[in-house]
């Protein structure tokens, strides 16, 4: 099928439908896909959400790898394996994991962008847009929001296709949206 360009970024707010849209887009690109999940189950609510996502993916026969911290290394390790598309869900959760560990984030961003650039398979990356809300009331939250925006800009600059999802509806910000089926 091969409908997608090399790098597609799907961006949207919380519960905007971005993950469902990204999954459908990926499945339309071919049947042999890898799902890189980045959400770490740090509390009961998150564990429940992850369980729901895992059950949904199992029905669609996704191959899944978890990459809570080592996303660039995980992508690098996929160079010898052949998939139609690699879906990363989600960049903001990966950033959360790194932020909480106080890693050198600018260096981590550079490393990830380099891995994305070098990837030979089609990539679909899901991320959150945090800049539409109110300005956070504390320094740590403002710093996180700013870092998320910086990372999104770096990935969007590399992307061939950038799609914003609002209320389950896609809007193309960069590139051309391929015609896809909603049968998945």
Regions found by a protein language model. Give the residues of each.
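Pre-Walker A adenine-sensing motif
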Residues: 1
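Conserved P-loop
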Residues: 4, 8-77
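Short, glycine/serine-rich, charged loops/turns that create anion-binding
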Residues: 15, 40, 92, 130-131
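Residue-level signal for inorganic ion chemistry
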Residues: 22, 53, 87, 128, ...
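Residues at the starts of beta-strands that form the adenosine-phosphate
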Residues: 31-34, 84, 122, 161
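A short, N-terminal amphipathic alpha-helix
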Residues: 56, 69-79, 114-117, 150, ...
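Helix-adjacent hinge/juxtasegments
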Residues: 60-108
């Amino acid at each position: 099928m091969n409908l997608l360009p090399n790098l597609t970024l799907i961006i949207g707010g919380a519960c905007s439908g971005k993950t469902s849209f990204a999954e459908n887009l990926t499945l339309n690109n071919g049947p042999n896909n890898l799902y890189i999940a980045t959400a770490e189950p740090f509390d009961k609510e998150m564990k429940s959400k992850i369980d729901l996502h895992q059950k949904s993916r199992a029905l669609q026969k996704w191959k899944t790898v978890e990459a809570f911290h080592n996303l660039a290394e995980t992508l690098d390790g996929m160079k010898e394996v052949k998939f139609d598309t690699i879906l990363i869900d989600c960049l903001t959760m990966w950033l959360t994991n790194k932020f909480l560990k106080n890693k050198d984030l600018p260096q981590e961003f550079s490393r990830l962008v380099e891995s994305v650039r070098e990837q030979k398979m089609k990539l679909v990356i899901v991320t959150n847009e945090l800049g539409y809300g109110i300005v956070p009331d504390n320094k740590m939250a403002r710093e996180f929001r700013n870092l998320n925006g910086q990372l999104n800009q770096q990935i969007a600059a590399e992307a061939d296709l950038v799609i914003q999802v609002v209320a389950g509806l896609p809007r193309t910000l960069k590139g051309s949206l391929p015609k896809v089926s909603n049968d998945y």
